[in-house]
Amino acid sequence: LTSGSTWHAAANIHGLHDSANISRLQHYTMKLYNELEAETGQSCGVFQPGSLYLAQTENREHQLRLQAAKAKLYGMNFHEIGRDEAERLHPLVNFDGIRCIMYEPDGGNVDPSGVTNAYAVGARQRGAEIHRFTPVTATVQQPDGSWIVETPKGNIHTPWVINAAGLWGREVAKLAGIELPLQPTEHQY
């Protein structure tokens, strides 16, 4: 597991996004990682020193103040702090010219390999089987809603199929007749 692009993902965690639904999902997963560690015994590498959001321009300040209002609506902790507190939290940053500083105490990052393996441990604890190095050639939904997953190693009958194909997720979804609007892109970080 995690031999594709997962192992080097930035894995930043924060609760706010321009979309309300994605904000709720991100906020939920920030809590989930700690629960997942406790439940499975597998470390997710959760590190939450907090995140600072800085505004140098009027437009960015306006955007951060909108984010703070959304955070309040969603019940998230995202608030303005003064320069003194920001310097205490991050003494290496030069805050000259900064108009507004917001702080998200729960912001941080996780270990993407640890998270993946914690999900795998949790799934196995609940009876899931993970078939690595087993290409799927077809999926056939049965009348009762279960699935036959066809592979070169034989067919697998299962009540659920989880598409964890990452970069190849769109192609795997097509095997089930699903058009997944997923487009892999190359990026630098």
Regions found by a protein language model. Give the residues of each.
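A short, glycine/Asx- and small/polar-enriched loop/turn
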Residues: N59, H90-I98, V140-I148
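Dinucleotide-binding Rossmann-like beta1-alpha1 core, especially the glycine-rich loop
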Residues: A10-L89
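Helical element adjacent to the flavin cofactor pocket in flavoenzyme catalytic cores
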Residues: M102-W160, A164, W168-E171
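Short amphipathic alpha-helical segments
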Residues: W7, L66, A173-G177
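Residue-level detector of anion-binding/catalytic polar loops
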Residues: N77, E129, E179
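Glycine-rich beta-alpha-beta "Rossmann" dinucleotide-binding loop(s) and their flanking helix/strand
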Residues: E171-Y189
